[in-house]
A protein has these predicted regions:
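Conserved lysine of the Walker
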Residues: 14
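Conserved substrate/cofactor phosphate-moiety recognition/catalytic segment
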Residues: 19, 23-62
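P-loop (Walker A) phosphate-binding loop of NTP-binding proteins
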Residues: 9
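Hydrophobic anchor at the beta1->P-loop junction of P-loop NTPases
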Residues: 6
């Protein structure tokens, strides 16, 4: 049962790729949790709080737990990268304990949570969508955190580069292999 996580910074093509491969692979596409949380009125990215990051983490974990197989255009790795940036750039307060508990759960889960992890490096300019930041420096910082987390937690991953069509072909072939 494939559990496919597509990871990378914002505006790297994760959603486009996930939407393109889910149906041909016969796998459910996990909802994009951060956008759901934003629709509830919570602030994301640089303006998020430990409580918001904890909510995103719990929703992502829940979505992954209730599906035996899936394609996700986000993962616990993504959540940890963004939350790490948010919390590293705020003064520590007692609510950080919420996030600390999430990190412990994630560290236990990361290596066994996914059968395939595909990392999308930054290759394209940021596409404005009304929600994502337009800051290439922030995009690069998140990308660096993502790779560091993958390596730190010994998560096996494969990089995908090239056009959307090339990425679709490569991901599909690797999952079906």
């Amino acid at each position: 049962m494939p559990r496919v996580a597509i990871v990378g910074s914002f505006s790297t093509g994760k959603t486009t790729l996930a939407e393109a491969v889910a149906e041909p692979l016969g796998l459910p596409l996990l909802p994009e949790v951060a956008r759901e949380v934003a629709s509830l009125g919570f602030k994301l990215d640089k303006d998020a709080t430990p409580e918001v990051e904890t909510l995103i983490f719990l929703r992502q974990l829940y979505n992954e737990m209730i599906h035996d197989d899936f394609v996700g255009d986000r993962s616990l790795i993504d959540v940890m990268a963004y939350a790490g940036w948010v919390l590293d750039n705020q003064q520590r307060r007692r609510e950080f304990a919420l996030w600390d508990a999430c990190v412990k759960v994630a560290e236990y889960q990361l290596r066994s949570q996914y059968t395939h992890v595909f990392y999308l490096p930054i290759e394209f300019p940021i596409v404005p969508d009304g929600l994502r930041p337009l800051d290439p420096d922030f995009q690069k910082e998140i990308d660096e955190r993502m790779v560091k987390l993958l390596d730190l937690h010994d998560v096996k991953y494969e990089s995908l580069t090239g056009s959307v069509e090339e990425r679709i072909e490569e991901l599909t072939a690797r999952v079906k292999a």
